[in-house]
Amino acid sequence: MADSEFEEFHRPIFEPHTIAGFGSGAGSKKNNPHAFYSLIPNDDLEDSHSSKSDGDGSDQEDGIGLVDHEPKMRQVEDDELGDGLKVTLSSDGSLDTNDSFNSHRHHPLNHQDAIGGFLGMDTSGLGGNSAPVTIGASTDLLAPNTAATRRRRKLPEIPKNKKSSILHLLGGSNFGSLADEFRNGGGGGIPPAVRSGQQRSFLSLKCGYLMDEDSSPDSERMQSLGDVDSGHSTAHSPNDFKSMSPQITSPVSQSPFPPPFGGVPFGQLEMLEATHRGLHKFVPRHHDEIELEIGDAIYVQKEAEDLWCEGVNLRTGRQGIFPSAYAVDLDYNEFDPTVQLVKKERYLLGYLGSVETLAHKGTGVVCQAVRKIVGEYGNSPTGQTCILEVSDQGLRMVDRSGPNQNKKDKKPCIDYFYSLKNVSFCAFHPRDHRFIGFITKHPTVQRFACHVFKGSESTRPVAEAVGRAFQRFYQKFIETAYPIEDIYIE
């Protein structure tokens, strides 16, 4: 059976009358379009294998059109079988196949018609004036051992009216189509300025989350993850973290930090006195923390129980929190074990004035003093901003902004200290908590005076701080005046 198939396959090649019949001329081949249909049944690369079942009229028109154009390299592959079969028609009219013995098995074509169509294509493409086709060339090309490269998969054509979705979001009306960009070789038709701006836009889209502030722990993207820590180091503080975590609204404002807890806004840094120095460098990791360098002058306003301090870095003018271990007191008393530590609480208030009183205690006495001083200033008293420092030793009023002002508007420098044993009473106004006053006694004469202050918020924390100082002072006084150690010794 194999011998008969071989003889049937090679019969059109070795019989010379078949060549004479096909090499008669170009005019005779135009009248036989069936040879072209038999040779290339799947010539259209984009059509499926089932396109061979279409009408003969469309196939005839395609076959005749192939004769009018220049001969090109064509490849036919059986996509349905997937066996890698390839039939190549080169520009010189030669036929190449990967597997000549399998080709007649998969394609139910007449071998004689195929060879006739191939020879007719060669003679008609040359206009009938070319030399006769040799048999040896055909037998070499039809050999089963002929090597041929596999045709690469054809990619879909780039649509010309399709624009990039990213360019559309970036204002893609100014950009061309994708086909024009590839045709111009990477945007040759686009101005360099537009291309550079386009690259920057792509960079911001891909890496925008690295520079954007929405990547912070307070952003909506982080909050959408669920139960995530906000990142504030004061969130677990026993004190009110809202007051200890001021948010900076505008970095270019004249006062870069909001008012502190129980104080007025910091208008000038000169009025603040440095209480601590930076001992180590501290790099902030959250919004409510401030940066510290070694030797920075720091005004510590409050120290929480979790060993975090709230204060102002006088070098940078920023207010926030920082660990207490990164700052040291200016007196360096912490290094002296014999010196007892003194707790100090500082508040920024507006000093309105002092009036003499007849009694040494009572809320009514403070209200009467406030009414008298506010009546002199009017409905909106301003006062002189100063720092009220509360400690176990006493109350200190400090204001160092006077010498730095102009001579015309120069105010007296305030630096007064009242020993706690001479302070008899302290209370805030029951109706308006912004006003507070404390009564002091003259050291040698039986006379009393009430000192009135005003804060931007409620002054209840100031009164409570004075009350705690009284308790500590009284405890020390009892231990000194009535020692209990002597009782156990006896």
From Swiss-Prot:
Major site of localization recorded for this protein: cytoplasm
Example GO molecular function: protein kinase binding
Span of domain PID: 344-479
GO biological process terms, semicolon-separated: anterograde synaptic vesicle transport; axonal transport of mitochondrion; JNK cascade; regulation of JNK cascade; regulation of terminal button organization; retrograde synaptic vesicle transport
Gene3D superfamilies given in the database record: Pleckstrin-homology domain (PH domain)/Phosphotyrosine-binding domain (PTB), SH3 Domains
Keywords from the named record: Cytoplasm, Developmental protein, SH3 domain
PROSITE patterns assigned to the protein according to its UniProt record, in alphabetical order: PID (PS01179), SH3 (PS50002)
Record-annotated disulphide pairs: none
Entries under Pfam families matching the protein: PID (PF00640), SH3_9 (PF14604)
Family: Belongs to the JIP scaffold family.
Name of this chain's protein: JNK-interacting protein 1
